From Swiss-Prot:
<keyword id="KW-0804">Transcription</keyword>
<dbReference type="GO" id="GO:0003700">
    <property type="term" value="F:DNA-binding transcription factor activity"/>
</dbReference>
<keyword id="KW-0238">DNA-binding</keyword>
<dbReference type="InterPro" id="IPR020886">
    <property type="entry name" value="Arc_TR_HTH"/>
</dbReference>
<dbReference type="Pfam" id="PF01381">
    <property type="entry name" value="HTH_3"/>
</dbReference>
<feature type="domain" description="HTH cro/C1-type">
    <location>
        <begin position="131"/>
        <end position="185"/>
    </location>
</feature>
<dbReference type="InterPro" id="IPR010982">
    <property type="entry name" value="Lambda_DNA-bd_dom_sf"/>
</dbReference>
<keyword id="KW-0805">Transcription regulation</keyword>
<protein>
    <recommendedName>
        <fullName>Putative HTH-type transcriptional regulatory protein AF_1787</fullName>
    </recommendedName>
</protein>
<dbReference type="GO" id="GO:0003677">
    <property type="term" value="F:DNA binding"/>
</dbReference>
<dbReference type="InterPro" id="IPR001387">
    <property type="entry name" value="Cro/C1-type_HTH"/>
</dbReference>
<feature type="DNA-binding region" description="H-T-H motif">
    <location>
        <begin position="142"/>
        <end position="161"/>
    </location>
</feature>
Length: 309
């Protein structure tokens, strides 16, 4: 069931001409698919029942969203005891959750959802400016509008300040003003996250991070991904691996697929000599890292190694 859902998501993305990389080969992971089209980068977590999303995975996904300037989306079919409904956005640990049909509508058809689920039912975001302009154009006072809706003047003022409301109330407002009164939900800008590069990492990995920072890179450690940090220097973004695992080339290959999908550089820092590169991933010996004195020199080293056979 999970594999079929992953396959369907990949097909939808390919139909919409996204570059796609899936992470089915790695665990643990905070996202299953990364995709890019033009300036849009998506980090996608796929779960049949979204109850199984862990809070630490959600936090890591939000952090990566900020670092990579990406948009996180969780895709599933069930939430708690119910099936997810088409056209409705749910929320889990601050991440947007939608079903496969809603994802298809959004990615392929360009149809944004308008309804979100929250305790108490389904709600919509009101277009406050449009409501106020329509009321004034019709010559209705706030009191007139309140009387027609059966609510207080204060409530109408809240609607015109942008408060959210139920579907039934939104329908009444639209009937009165004679125009569309709700806003689409922007799935690409759903999440706001704060990040800090000052996260402490101990041992040999911490030493590598410290050296990258010494030469002038901003370094954001990452968990639950096939890379260990995102290193940044001005406009250069480098997915960076440095865990000395047994199958280092296999991990680097997966890292390369992700970097190619999002059009980023990729480097793997190692204790001992490996191949010069695997796909788009450049291997850098620790001693080479310690021999460079600036971020600019490090980027030059990567480009130089990338051109070598």
């Amino acid at each position: 069931m999970y594999a079929a859902l992953i396959e369907s998501v990949v097909k939808i993305l390919q139909k919409a001409e996204f570059s796609v990389a899936d992470l089915a080969e790695t665990k643990p992971r905070c996202f299953d698919i990364v995709a890019r089209k033009d300036d849009v980068v998506l980090l996608i977590k796929v779960l049949y029942n979204v109850d199984s999303l862990k809070p630490e995975a959600a936090e890591e996904m939000k952090k990566l969203t900020k670092i990579l300037q990406a948009s996180p989306i969780v895709i599933g079919e069930r939430f708690k005891f119910d099936f997810l409904e088409r056209g409705v956005v749910y929320t889990r640990y601050g991440l947007p959750v939608i079903n496969l049909a809603t994802f298809y509508d959004f990615i392929v058809e360009g149809i944004y959802p308008y309804v979100y689920s929250a305790p108490g039912g389904y709600y919509v975001k009101l277009d406050s400016e449009r409501i106020r302009e329509a009321r004034e154009r019709l010559g209705l006072s706030v009191g007139d509008m309140a009387k027609m809706l059966g609510v207080s003047r204060r409530t109408v003022k809240k609607y015109e300040e942008g408060t959210d409301t139920t579907l039934s109330t939104a329908a009444k407002i639209e009937e009165i003003i004679g125009t569309f009164a709700i806003k689409e939900i922007d799935l690409l800008n759903f999440v706001e996250a704060d990040i800090s590069e000052e996260e402490e990492v101990e041992g040999e990995e911490g030493e590598i991070i410290e050296q990258l920072r010494v030469i002038g890179l901003s370094v954001y450690p990452v968990r639950q991904a096939p890379f260990d940090a995102v290193s940044q220097a001005k406009e250069d973004q480098i997915l960076t691996g440095f865990k000395q695992v047994r199958e280092i080339e296999k991990r680097a290959r997966l890292l390369g697929r992700i970097s190619e999908a999002i059009d980023a550089e990729a480097a793997y820092i190692t204790d001992k000599a490996c191949k010069k590169k695997v796909e788009s991933v450049v291997f850098v010996l620790k001693e080479e890292l310690y021999s460079v004195s600036s971020a600019k020199d490090f980027i030059s080293l990567l480009k130089e190694k990338s051109c070598e056979e």
